[in-house]
Amino acid sequence: MKEILLAENSGFCFGVKQAMEKTEKEIEKKQRNESAGALYTWGPLIHNQTVTDALRAQGVRIAENLDEVTAEDTLIVRSHGEARAFFEEADRRGIHVVDATCPFVKKIHDLVEEAYGKGYRIIILGDAQHPEVRGINGWCENSALVVPTAEAA
């Protein structure tokens, strides 16, 4: 008979757990009528269809464009984070944003912004189309060299 072992550290990472907790708090506010408008996540909160379906069943919508969200709505930024320009545009539109960016990712944003401000060239190892990489690149005005491997750098 085959045995299935569950890894001791399985499940959501810290950043995703935090994003889920913030989303649950926002759902509770909606249920208590403490916030007007709809509740959105910016893209799927996590890459897990079961979780996405469960959130949708609780009234959470997925936004892919800021034009979908009004100033009465709440928009949750997933743990991947977003570029500075995204936050500035949401603020300009008066959209209430709940930033669920993973603290580790936010630290990278801060380091990139600081280094870029000092004139350093930013190099990011990763998939240029991945939301986390796009978000990081957005903290240096999308000027980073994005390469898939250290060898390519």
Go through each PLM region and give its residues.
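The feature marks the mature, well-folded catalytic cores of soluble enzymes
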Residues: M1-A153
